């Protein structure tokens, strides 16, 4: 895939999915995901330069440490995170070559944990993952772009907000 994603068939996620299919809602739903890549165009034609994406990833690590790394289901236009739409928390990020990887914890409700009742965005995402749906991950941020041929290069004023779950 050319964009970030969470794949239920990824070997890193197989043990998580096996546990979740046993319907033990007491355990958190945690997954590994490709969050973003530098130096290659994504599906919307944007290219993130290495220097800019690494700078923003380092800044985002501070948000993770403070518990401020929430993200939403779907990808709103707003630069603000809407707590009614929060679906997951990024708990760790790291580099694998030019790929920014992450560990996500879906924020599910007590009703989902106790009875499988879907009532929050995190519940929806958890239920989709349990059913084997591959979801996309899209970085949300603000900043300018510069046209370079067919691609839009993200500029130095870019500020990363979060990594939303989207349809792939």
Per-region residue spans from a language model:
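Polar/acidic, low-complexity leader/linker segments enriched in S/T/G and N/D
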Residues: 1-68
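A short linear-motif detector with a strong N-terminal bias
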Residues: 7-13, 48-50, 80-84, 115-120, ...
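Residue microenvironments linked to proteolytic maturation
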Residues: 28, 66, 91-168
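Pocket-edge structural micro-motifs
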Residues: 35-37, 70-73, 104, 167
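Short, surface-exposed beta-strand/loop "edge" segments at domain boundaries and coil↔beta transitions
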Residues: 37-46, 77-82, 109-117
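Short conserved beta-strand and strand-loop elements enriched in small hydrophobics
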Residues: 64-83, 137
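Catalytic zinc-binding patch centered on the HExxH motif and its immediate surroundings
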Residues: 88
């Amino acid at each position: 895939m050319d964009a970030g994603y969470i794949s239920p068939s990824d070997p890193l996620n197989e043990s998580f999915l096996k546990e979740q299919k046993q319907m033990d809602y007491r355990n958190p739903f945690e997954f590994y995901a490709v969050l973003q890549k530098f130096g290659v165009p994504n599906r919307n034609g944007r290219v993130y330069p290495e220097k800019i994406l690494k700078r923003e990833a380092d800044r985002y690590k501070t948000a993770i440490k403070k518990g401020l790394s929430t993200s939403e289901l779907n990808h709103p236009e707003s630069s603000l995170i809407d707590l009614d739409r929060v679906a997951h928390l990024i708990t760790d990020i790291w580099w694998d070559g030019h790929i920014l990887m992450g560990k996500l914890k879906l924020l599910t409700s007590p009703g989902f944990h106790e009875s499988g009742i879907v009532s929050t965005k995190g519940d929806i995402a958890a239920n989709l993952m349990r059913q084997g749906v591959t979801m996309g991950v899209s970085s949300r941020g603000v900043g300018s772009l510069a046209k370079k041929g067919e691609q839009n290069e993200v500029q130095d004023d870019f500020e990363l907000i979060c990594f939303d779950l989207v349809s792939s």
